[in-house]
């Protein structure tokens, strides 16, 4: 090794120290993953070189054959991994190997579960895979030179994973990165060709780059040649280019883990080659769990884009709509040019056609999963259901298809589990029912006990219970499904159509007429709180209820707007009374107008609480209630 110059010792960023401590002391149950992570990084380095060399072929320095070499030295107890990819400059080394993006680290540490096997796989997802080397090594040396820089600008990084690292400038004639792991005592098993070969086959067979090991000679062949002979130990072909019939499920699963930096198997995948007007291959995966940043709409997302097997970019987000941002995979196009950029992707009509086809492909895959593997679909819904609910607003063309994939809780069950498909609901509709009834609210316990459901329980009509914050917004984009319109049971004047008999309707009219005097008194007292007072057709057990005006915002939408700092339009609820309830009868008979007013306000506030709303003046409610209790106990 050449003379080192400009040598300096630097301290690790605090988060890196935490991470190293974790790697060394916690993630030792699945040690072999260090090799998977380092190979994955080397593969990325080769992808980056290929991409940059499209615009600047000199970067290849005459060596366009990219590969990864893994070797070992039993006597020195070392494992060496070398690639001829893009390499790193001194600045890159200090940045990438001494610090981690704070957001990534914080999220990494937050996501640790204490389960060693799961935690060991999290490291790739958060871009900290390099540090897994310290699981098996007590010292790591990195020698690197960035493609395009002179040989004199190589860099040597070295650390024992304790609190600091050394960095020095060296001569390095060949571009790329060489990592030497000085194995800890007790980790000698990895300085072995057979062991390394098995780990590579297990985790990295799908890597499209040849991964080479030195050929081993045994018995009569034991005379080793002066120069090692290298042999490729992985398939080294892009998995998506192979015919589906030739790819085993296990290979698809391992490739997913590489692409998604995930440790769990995917729930489903779809591998397709499209020929004709457009030519491209796609391999799309539905993950088995939600990533930590699923609800950050600005978080990186998208597919890996290749053009004619050449890697172009990670996170190409133009191929799928935002509501499918959880889908992972690759798309390899023959129609795009090799110098394609993000700006071009946004304008190219070819992309629109591909996006439309890939979106349909994903929705078909989800339909198939729901139909053939309902338990797996339950897992999918638990992880990604709320994101899929963004679909009807974003993708009008596929609204009906997306609606068929949605799942809801309903009054038909007791668990609150979101397992009811709209098609199932329609299949159970009562004779004469032509609408899909639903109720939105803050929580399952609140909506299942809502007074709004009383008449539906009495008539045995199923009601969907929607408690996700996005639900009211979703329903504003979903007016109907399969020809049946949706009706919010808490909104407007409830009309059950033919589910109410003519006798029912006649009786309702007569009762409303008999209570006209009471309605007028209530209107006067509640003029500032209620937009309207009327007799209710919804109630069988409760004295009163609040309904939402046909054009007014519901509670969920008001809360979303308030939380985002937007102005919420002023609106008053409709106050409905149950004329047969003893409290309403007593109220009607109350001659003292002051006491009538106090009791009316108590009933109004109780109805607001039952609807999940907060009181504008809780103190006044408590004062009135206490006064009433004193009167009753006198």
From Swiss-Prot:
Keyword Cytoplasm on entry: yes
PROSITE patterns: HSP90
Subunit-level organization: Homodimer.
SUPFAM superfamilies: ATPase domain of HSP90 chaperone/DNA topoisomerase II/histidine kinase, HSP90 C-terminal domain, Ribosomal protein S5 domain 2-like
HAMAP family membership: HSP90
Family from the record: Belongs to the heat shock protein 90 family.
Keywords, comma-separated and alphabetical: ATP-binding, Chaperone, Cytoplasm, Nucleotide-binding, Stress response
Compartment list: Cytoplasm
C: annotated segments: 560-634
Alphabetized GO MF terms: ATP binding; ATP hydrolysis activity; ATP-dependent protein folding chaperone; unfolded protein binding
Protein name, as recorded: Chaperone protein HtpG
Disulfide-bond pairs as recorded: none
Region (A): 1-342
Transmembrane helix among keywords: no
GO CC annotations on file: cytoplasm
Role summary: Molecular chaperone. Has ATPase activity.
Pfam families (alphabetical): HATPase_c_3 (PF13589), HSP90 (PF00183)
Stretch forming the signal peptide: none
Region (B): 343-559
């Amino acid at each position: 090794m050449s003379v080192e110059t400009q040598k300096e010792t630097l301290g690790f960023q605090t988060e890196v120290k935490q991470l190293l401590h974790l790697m060394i002391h916690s993630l030792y149950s699945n040690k072999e993953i260090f090799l998977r992570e380092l190979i994955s990084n080397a593969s990325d380095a080769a992808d980056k070189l290929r991409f940059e060399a499209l615009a600047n072929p000199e970067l290849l320095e005459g060596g366009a054959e990219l590969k990864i070499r893994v070797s070992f030295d039993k006597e020195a107890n070392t494992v060496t991994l070398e690639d001829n990819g893009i390499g790193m400059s001194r600045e890159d080394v200090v940045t990438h190997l001494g610090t981690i993006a704070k957001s990534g680290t914080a999220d990494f540490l937050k996501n640790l579960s204490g389960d060693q096997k799961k935690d060991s796989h999290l490291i790739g997802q958060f871009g900290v895979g390099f540090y897994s080397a310290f699981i098996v090594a007590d010292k790591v040396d990195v020698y690197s030179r960035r493609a395009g820089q002179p040989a004199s600008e190589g860099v040597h990084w070295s650390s024992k994973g304790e609190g600091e690292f050394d960095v020095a400038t060296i001569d390095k004639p060949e571009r790329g990165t060489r990592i030497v792991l000085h194995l800890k005592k007790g980790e000698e098993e990895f300085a072995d060709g057979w062991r390394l070969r098995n780990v590579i086959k297990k985790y990295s067979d799908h890597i499209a780059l040849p991964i080479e090991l030195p050929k081993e000679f045994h018995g009569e062949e034991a005379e080793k040649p002066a120069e090692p002979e290298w042999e490729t130990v992985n398939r080294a072909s892009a998995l998506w280019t192979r015919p589906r019939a030739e790819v085993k499920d296990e290979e698809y699963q391992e490739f997913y883990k590489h692409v998604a930096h995930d440790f769990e198997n995917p729930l489903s995948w779809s591998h397709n080659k499209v020929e004709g007007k457009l030519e491209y291959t796609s391999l799309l995966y539905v993950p088995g769990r939600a990533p930590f940043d699923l609800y950050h709409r600005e978080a990186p997302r998208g597919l890996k884009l290749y053009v004619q097997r050449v890697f172009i970019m990670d996170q190409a987000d133009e191929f799928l709509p935002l509501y499918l941002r959880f889908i992972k995979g690759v798309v390899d196009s023959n129609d795009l040019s090799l110098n394609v950029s993000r700006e071009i992707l946004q304008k190219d009509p070819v992309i629109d056609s591909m996006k439309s086809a890939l979106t349909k492909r994903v929705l078909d895959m989800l339909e198939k999963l729901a139909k053939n593997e309902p338990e797996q679909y339950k897992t999918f819904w638990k992880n990604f259901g709320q994101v899929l609910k963004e679909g009807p607003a974003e993708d009008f063309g596929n609204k009906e298809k997306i609606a068929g994939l949605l799942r809801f809780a309903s009054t038909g069950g007791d668990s609150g589990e979101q397992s009811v498909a709209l098609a199932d609901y329609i299949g159970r509709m009562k004779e004469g029912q032509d609408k899909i009834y639903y109720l939105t609210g803050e929580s399952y316990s609140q909506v299942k006990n809502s007074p709004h459901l009383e008449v539906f329980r009495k008539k045995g009509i199923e009601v969907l219970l929607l408690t996700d914050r996005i639900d009211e917004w979703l329903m504003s984009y979903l007016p109907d499904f399969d020809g049946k319109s949706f009706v919010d049971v808490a909104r407007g004047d409830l009309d059950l159509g033919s589910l109410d008999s003519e006798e029912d309707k006649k009786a309702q009219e007569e009762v409303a007429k008999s209570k006209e005097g009471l309605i007028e008194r209530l209107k006067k007292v509640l003029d500032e709180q209620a937009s309207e007072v009327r007799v209710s057709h919804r109630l069988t057990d409760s004295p009163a209820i609040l309904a939402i005006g046909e054009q007014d915002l519901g509670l969920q939408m008001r809360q979303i707007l308030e939380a985002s700092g937007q102005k919420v339009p002023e609106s008053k609820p409709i106050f409905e009374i149950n004329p047969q309830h003893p409290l309403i009868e007593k109220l009607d008979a109350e001659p003292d107008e002051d006491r009538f007013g106090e009791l009316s306000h108590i009933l109004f506030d109780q109805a607001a609480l039952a609807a999940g709303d907060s009181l504008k003046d809780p103190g006044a409610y408590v004062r009135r209630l206490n006064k009433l209790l004193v009167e009753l106990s006198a």
